[in-house]
């Protein structure tokens, strides 16, 4: 796949599912560190999602903006390793790789725009063309970072995805519809969407109530809602339920589909 925009004009794009909740990291250890400590394990997860039918996969770098902002030793090597592992796996299936960037803190010492910018520019230097800013509770600093990224990589495909509760608001009290309109008005974002926090049924209701949008929509819900059993966090939601709800989400016009926490290759294959 060479041109995502052209691809989306003809059919939906299927992403992978959760990385951190599927990869069995040791308690207290950041999943991203596995890029360096267990590269074969990370590549195996990528390969399983690709075998399940994913046409796009995310780098295992969700926490990179915060790591970059804190100047965590070795964050650049972690990004490079995550990028290479995903690219190696995707090359075997002609899939596309998205540089994955989770939420950044916004402080006076380290503005969110700087954190996003550092992480995104690191991937740009590695040759990344596709970027996903995900699980955001606000748009603070995002558009500024994306504008700079657009200068560095003019033909980049850039997605911004927000974590929204079933009532349509983020945990910072921002309405998704307003965030969507701001991303559409920015002129630099290629797709906007929802991921994490909510289950497929809740996201289905949200997108069905949106009406027509100017940008392609992405929806990547959790498998269900988390329950704690014997000190383990488990997500309710069988692959069959996930597939049924995602089919209805696609029927509502959503062009980019995938999964977040609790989803597995079985959910993507379904």
State the predicted function of each range:
Residues 1-270:
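Domain-level signal for soluble alpha/beta catalytic cores
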């Amino acid at each position: 796949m060479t041109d995502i925009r052209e691809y989306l004009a003809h059919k939906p794009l299927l992403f992978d599912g959760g990385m951190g909740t599927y990869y069995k990291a040791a308690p207290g250890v950041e999943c991203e560190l596995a890029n360096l400590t267990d590269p074969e394990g990370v590549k195996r997860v990528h390969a399983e999602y690709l075998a399940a039918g994913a046409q796009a996969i995310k780098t295992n770098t969700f926490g990179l903006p915060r790591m970059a902002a804190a100047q965590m030793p070795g964050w650049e090597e972690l990004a490079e390793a995550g990028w290479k592992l995903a690219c190696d796996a995707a090359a075997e299936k002609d899939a596309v790789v998205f540089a994955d960037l989770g939420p950044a803190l916004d402080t006076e010492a380290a503005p969110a725009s700087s954190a996003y910018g550092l992480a995104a520019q690191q991937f740009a230097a590695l040759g990344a063309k596709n970027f996903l800013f995900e699980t955001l509770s606000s748009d603070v600093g995002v558009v500024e970072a994306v504008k700079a990224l657009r200068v560095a990589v003019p033909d980049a495909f850039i997605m911004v995805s927000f974590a929204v509760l079933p009532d349509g608001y983020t945990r910072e009290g921002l309405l998704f519809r307003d965030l969507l309109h701001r991303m559409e008005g920015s002129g630099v974002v290629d797709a906007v969407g929802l991921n994490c926090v909510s289950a497929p049924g809740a996201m289905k209701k949200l997108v069905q109530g949106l009406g027509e949008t100017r940008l392609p929509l992405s929806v990547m819900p959790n498998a269900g809602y988390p329950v704690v059993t014997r000190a383990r966090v488990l997500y309710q939601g069988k692959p069959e339920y996930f597939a049924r709800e995602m089919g209805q989400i696609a029927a509502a016009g959503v062009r980019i589909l995938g999964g977040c926490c609790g989803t597995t290759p079985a959910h993507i294959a379904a």
